[in-house]
């Protein structure tokens, strides 16, 4: 199922990129969005998560953690390249290209109003909600 930002025109969007389903930090981040979903809905804000995982992986992740928002699959990295979130990482002494945890706030007209790079999960949701009300 294809999604485009124009599908959400007229609504604010939180587009968050995360490295991988079912890893500790990514799971904590998804659960933090889940737990704050009413605050986002109260402001008519759509949450979209995106990673390089498959649709099947996302479906299991959503079911396992009861996530009330859409996770998008970017297995060919097209969207990751557009948002420049693929960065070189050092994983166990080996260099690899992976998603840098990033969040983009997008306004009702489809313009990016705020970019968070190298996101730390703790306090991130509160930061987003504060910036969405400005």
Where do the protein language model's features map onto the residues?
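Chalcogenol-based redox active-site neighborhoods
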Residues: 1-134
